[in-house]
Amino acid sequence: MQNNKIIVGISGGVDSSVSALLLKQQGYDVTGVFMKNWEEDDTDEFCSAEQHIADAQAVCDSIGIPFKKINFAAEYWDNVFEHFLTEYKAGRTPNPDILCNKEIKFKAFLSYVHLLGGDYIATGHYARTKVIDDGSVQLVKGLDDSKDQTYFLYTLGQEQLKQTMFPIGDIEKSRVREIAKENNLVTFDKKDSTGICFIGERKFKDFLSKFLPAQKGEIHDENGIKIGMHDGLMYYTIGQRQGLGIGGVKNRPEIPWFAAQKDLENNVLIAVQGHDHPMLFKDTLQAIDLSWVAGSAPADSFRCSAKVRYRQKDQPCSVEVNNDGSVNVVFDEPQRAITPGQSVVFYDNDVCLGGGIII
């Protein structure tokens, strides 16, 4: 396998840098490729797109591997960003990083890798793969549970996983930084990127308002009484506390308010008081657009655990697969702030089974 040509997605961050280094050290024929998915040079608070490219180039030069750039901005706009806007317009809260992995990193990029004559792609995700007895590949959580990224990778199928390597999946994040420092990689102390890939660290509200006209409306309490005004339903997520702008409501205790529901028909945001208000909790959800890593669901009904957001602790649940492919999920314990548009991802211990979009 050591003669195989591996194309590493190099982002200019420490995780992909160390992934490329480890593969080179293991004797593979490695090429680093930087994917540019967004045209505007979005100078964020700590690093511009040009800086990411420069860091990626420096890492490849340091390791001694070829460096290439590929522009997927058109594909990203058509297959990720327009869907992102459509979802927000509909009052849902999408996760573009999941769609980016599905449409760009493990689809458009994979096709490009084939053009380069690559045998495998590699990324700096904290995840692992495992080939089981029947020859199929499982998607397994990364060793560093606090950094596990299988939540973002649940749309990957067998064909993609058979051609993918996750070199740092078996390593703790702290060790990844040590390896980068020991090998004098410029990214060793670079801050982890947060936020949506095309927004960087900019204020989300400012960014979204450039693309979608906001429609202001009223904020009501659970009894339908007006308690404030909102700037546009798309700016709010279920369970959100910050930025509601509700304060000093007459005859109400000084307890924080949280976004609980969106009444799209009437353009009303419903807010409730208290982090643990019953309206913020549900023990059931329905999901559509299911992706199963193995190619199909484990059974028509099964027990497993699930996450309704990244970094949430796995929650025990029962899953029922409907005739149309959607699923009904019943949790053993009520879950806070289940959010339409986000993904629910299913696990059997450390094995990621797949997931879908919450409606």
Swiss-Prot record:
Give the signal peptide range: none
Supply the NCBIfam families for this chain.
PRK00143.1, trmU
The record lists the membrane-crossing segments as none
Q: Where does ATP bind?
A: 9-16, 35, 124
The encoding gene is mnmA
Family named by the database record = Belongs to the MnmA/TRMU family.
What name has this protein been given in UniProt? Answer: tRNA-specific 2-thiouridylase MnmA
The site annotation (Interaction with tRNA) covers 125, 342
Q: List the disulfide bonds.
A: 100-197
Q: What is its EC number?
A: 2.8.1.13
Segment Interaction with tRNA: which positions? 147-149, 309-310
> What residue spans carry the region label Interaction with target base in tRNA?
95-97
**Matching Pfam families:** tRNA_Me_trans, tRNA_Me_trans_C, tRNA_Me_trans_M
Query: Which InterPro entries does this entry report, sorted A to Z?
Result: MnmA-like (IPR004506), MnmA-like_C (IPR046885), MnmA-like_central (IPR046884), MnmA-like_central_sf (IPR023382), Rossmann-like_a/b/a_fold (IPR014729)
Q: Which GO terms describe its cellular component?
A: cytoplasm
Give this protein's Gene Ontology molecular function annotations.
ATP binding; tRNA binding; tRNA-uridine 2-sulfurtransferase activity
Q: What class of enzyme is it?
A: transferase
Give the primary localization class.
cytoplasm
Q: What's this protein's function?
A: Catalyzes the 2-thiolation of uridine at the wobble position (U34) of tRNA, leading to the formation of s(2)U34.
User: What is the reaction catalyzed?
Assistant: S-sulfanyl-L-cysteinyl-[protein] + uridine(34) in tRNA + AH2 + ATP = 2-thiouridine(34) in tRNA + L-cysteinyl-[protein] + A + AMP + diphosphate + H(+)
**Organism for this UniProt entry:** Francisella philomiragia subsp. philomiragia (strain ATCC 25017 / CCUG 19701 / FSC 153 / O#319-036)
